[in-house]
Curated annotation (Swiss-Prot):
Gene assigned in the entry: ruvB
Species, as recorded: Synechococcus sp. (strain CC9902)
Chain segments carrying region Small ATPAse domain (RuvB-S): 199-270
UniProt feature, compositional bias: Polar residues: 1-10
GO cellular component terms, semicolon-separated: cytoplasm; Holliday junction resolvase complex
Protein name: Holliday junction branch migration complex subunit RuvB
Binding site for DNA: 328, 333
Catalytic activity as recorded in UniProt: ATP + H2O = ADP + phosphate + H(+)
Top-level division of the source organism's lineage: Bacteria
Pfam families: AAA_lid_4, RuvB_C, RuvB_N
Length: 347
């Protein structure tokens, strides 16, 4: 299976990545099949049992008919394995996987170039698909539905339409904001699946697997503590494990990493036993201390914290909501009794 990555080559603004930020750090955005921690097959993919069952049946049916897999939309919070699942699907289908992201498809020729170079039954993965431009979306409509490209050649009175036939292919789109997709684009996906936060048992299995792959020896309690502190997100679990490994190699050298060493490493990075970092606790503490627990509007909250409202809503809040530490009301955000207890314990 070939993996081809496409990007615009434009540098994004530099920002500090929090240890428990589910967005990928720069070094995590590079896909290296030879040293990747990603599973290769559905049987190796831990968690998301319903998703695996649905996609496994679809893959087996497509292979049995000798057809391309239907188009797939994967959505959910960042860091849960959407890109990994796309690579797994390509491996299961035995086809090439071409990887790009919506911001890289700025001009019509960018997406046209990708589509015309696809081989039969290839898989095209578009990350952040909700950020596609209107022109790119309109090019995808006939490509997804009728396997053709409708191109306009020339301008004004000399303009004419040229149609190019495309081979059967599978588009896998990934997004953290499924509601931002236009209805015409969303309706062209035959399989629409949500990835959920991972449970403790699955996360422990992921941490144990990663530890084995990177030759780190963990006690069961150490593995459990990392799993409990990763916000239900495999990407964060692997990142925490790397930071624990760093601290352990300096503090004790080689040897088994125990629960106490993990606790020391997480404390050093200001990550508590529930996966909250200093920014999360500051948000909850500000709501309680300055606003009596809320409600507080998103814009006000973002301004007080110096955060972008979209980042706050899509990256920070989902985990706090899932943990029952924060609630959204028509009047704004409010802390819960569980949040008050947690902040009191951390004080």
């Amino acid at each position: 299976m070939a993996i081809v990555s496409s990007s615009s080559g434009r540098k994004s603004p530099c920002r500090e990545t929090a240890l428990v930020d589910p967005q990928p750090a720069p070094e995590e955005q590079v896909i290296r099949p030879e040293d990747s921690l990603r599973p290769k097959r559905l049987s190796e993919y831990i968690g998301q049992s319903e998703l695996k069952q649905v996609l496994g049946i679809a893959v087996e049916a497509a292979l049995g008919r000798g057809e391309a897999l239907d188009h797939v939309l994967l959505y959910g919070p960042p860091g849960l394995g959407k890109t990994t699942m796309a690579l797994v699907l390509a491996e299961e289908l035995g086809v090439n996987c071409r990887i790009t992201s919506a911001p890289a498809l700025e001009r019509p020729r960018d997406i046209v170039g990708l589509l015309v170079n696809l081989q039969p039954r290839d898989l095209l993965f578009i990350d952040e698909i909700h950020r596609l431009s209107r022109v790119a979306e309109e090019l995808l409509y006939p490509a997804m539905e009728d396997r053709r490209l409708d191109l306009t050649v020339g301008k004004g009175s000399t303009a004419r339409t040229r149609t190019l036939d495309l081979p059967p292919f599978t588009l896998v789109g990934a997004t953290t904001r499924a509601g931002s997709l236009s209805s015409p684009l969303r309706d062209r996906f035959g399989l629409i699946q949500r990835l959920e936060f991972y449970g403790q048992t699955d996360l422990e299995a992921i941490v144990a697997r990663t530890a084995e792959l990177v030759s780190v020896d963990l006690t069961f309690d150490a593995c459990a503590r990392i799993a409990a502190s990763c916000r239900g997100t495999p990407r964060i679990a692997n990142r925490l494990l790397r930071r624990v490994r760093d601290v352990a190699s300096v503090r004790q050298g080689k040897g088994t990493i125990d629960d106490a060493m993990v606790a020391e490493a997480l404390s050093l990075h200001r990550v508590d036993h529930r996966g909250l970092d200093a920014s999360d606790r500051r948000l909850l503490a500000m709501l309680m201390d300055q606003h009596g627990g809320g409600p507080v509007g998103l814009e006000t909250l973002a301004a007080a914290l110096g955060e972008d409202p979209v980042t706050l809503e899509t990256v920070v809040e989902p985990f706090l909501l899932q943990q029952g530490l924060l609630v959204r009301t028509p009047r704004g955000r409010m802390v819960t009794d569980a949040a008050r207890s947690h902040i009191a314990e951390a004080a």
